[in-house]
Structures are given as C-alpha cells and as structure tokens.
A protein has these predicted regions:
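Active-site helix-to-loop segments that bind/position phosphate- or nucleotide-bearing substrates
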Residues: 1-162, 170, 183-196, 219, ...
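Conserved glycine-/histidine-rich ATP-lid loop and adjacent helix of the Bergerat-fold HATPase_c
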Residues: 227-232
Length: 276
C-alpha cells in the first residue's frame, strides 16, 4: 500500500523541515552512509519516499513519503481517515494533561514529527539509572528501547484507510497504543516473534534507517522481555473487530508476588493430579 506512487502530487508537497530533520538524524547515526551524499530528490527516492511515475516520468511522493513527510492537510486528501492522537491523562481531575493531534494545524501532522514529539513525551518520566561508558553518561535503557519499538510498531502496522485513527494514551499507570487494522500475523505470533509482516513496508524501512524498529519480527517479544525484567505486569495485546483495531497495553504495575503458602498448595495440587 505505502509503495504506491501519488502521480498527481508534486514533490514540493512534502514538508521540507521534516525531511531535513530526518536527514540530520540519519547523518548523525550513520555518518558514512552513502545516502548522505545524495541531494534531497535522490535521497527521497533512495529511501522509498518518492518514485518516478510511469505516467509522466517525473518524481512524485509515494504514499509512504506523504505519510512520513507530508503536511496533514495534504495527507488527508489521499487518506481521508488519517488521524494521529496523543492523549496524556495523568490527573484524574483533568480531562487531558497534554494532547497532540495531527489535525490541530499547529505542526506538520505527519508521522515522522508525531513519532519524535510523542516519544519525548512518553519517556520524560522514566527514571534513568546512572551509567557511563568511556566517561559519557548513557541515558538510554531497555525501557526506552521498548517504548520506541511499541510506538514505531503502532505506526508501521496501521491501516491508514481504517477509521478512528491512531491513538496513544499515556496514563499514570500504563501506556496504550491503538492502531486501525487487524494484526497481520495474529497476536500469538506477535508475542512469539520471528515473523515480520508489516502493513507499511516502506515506512518500516525509513524507521529502520534511523535505527528505530526491529525488522526481524523480534520487536514485540523484546517489549515483553523488558517488562518481565522490570517485574511489571505482562503486556496485553488486544484485537478488536468491526472496526478492526489492534491495541498494545503496557502497564507499569508490579506483578503480585505469589505467597509461599500458595506456591506449596499449587505444588500439592499438581502432584495430586499426576498421582490420579
């Protein structure tokens, strides 16, 4: 879907500032990457954000390029149901403590800018243990990595023709990621990992180029492993139908410790079952 060429859209419809921000991140992460030498048009073509049309033989944005780098008012011309919504609900007495919507007109409203704005909001309350490498403090943790994966996964696997859009909710004790569209691998395979079948393959490529997202299908299992290591309640994957939606719920509640007496009773029950 996201490989389609938008033959009637000029390349100038993409947001220049978003493109430059993305390129700067790419250069910083991979200074020797050969794409760094390309001009903007060649670069967009190389990452899949633009392609030569078979109709007029000119360069036009792809669907992925429009979603990643376009302005919201241009994106909705091609994806009428497109909507990105971040809701922060940390105080129960206030409806929203923070909100970011793609349709506000206060920013570009594209996927690239949404990702970085929302990620910064998600991690601002995460406690970072003091750790240094070669004298430099490391502010990244497995929890940061898991949240990057969860947010990218939500965007990469969304059906942008589906209704109700993408919703990310940050609450006091959990974060919920919702995207339109069913899980193409099924929720059990998502947990198991090993199979990657993203709905938007070019979007995945563009995130991978800046070191975001796991292409090998191990991203969701890594999230589960991180939550296990933290002692938090296991993440929940929900599938809803009519309309199709996929939810990933990450709770920060600690697992309830099993009492010693309960463990002994469980062992007795298992032993008795085997004897009978």
């Amino acid at each position: 879907m996201d490989m389609d060429v938008l033959d009637d859209v000029p390349i100038s419809d993409l947001n220049y500032e978003t493109i430059q921000g993305y390129r700067n991140r790419h250069r910083a992460l991979k200074p020797a990457h050969p794409f760094g030498r390309l001009n903007d048009s060649e670069y967009l073509r190389s990452i899949g954000a633009a392609a030569i049309s078979n109709i007029d033989k000119c360069l036009h944005p792809t669907a992925a390029g429009m979603l990643m780098f376009g302005d919201e008012y241009n994106i909705v011309r091609h994806f009428p149901e497109y909507f990105l919504d971040y809701r922060e609900i940390l105080d129960p007495t206030i409806r929203w403590t923070d909100r970011l919507q793609s349709s506000s007109g206060e920013w570009s409203g594209n996927i690239c800018d949404f990702y970085f704005r929302v990620y910064n909001k998600l991690v601002k309350d995460i406690k970072v243990p003091f750790k240094t490498i070669d004298g430099n403090r490391i502010d990244d943790t497995p929890v940061h990595e898991a949240l990057r994966e969860a947010l990218a996964n939500c965007l990469i696997n969304a059906d942008f023709y589906g209704v109700r859009g993408i919703v990310v909710r940050k609450e006091a004790d959990r974060i919920v990621f919702e995207n339109p569209g069913y899980s193409r691998t099924g929720k059990q395979q998502m947990k198991k990992g090993g199979i990657s079948d993203p709905r938007n393959k070019v979007l995945m490529k563009m995130f991978n180029l800046i070191n975001i997202g796991e292409r090998a299908g191990s991203g969701v299992p890594n999230i589960f492993n991180t939550w296990e290591d933290q002692g938090w309640v296991e993440p929940v994957i929900e599938e809803q139908f009519d309309p199709d939606r996929t939810l990933l719920i990450l709770s920060f509640d600690k697992k309830q410790a099993i009492k010693t007496s309960d463990k002994k009773q469980a062992i007795k029950t298992v032993s008795y079952t085997h004897l009978t």
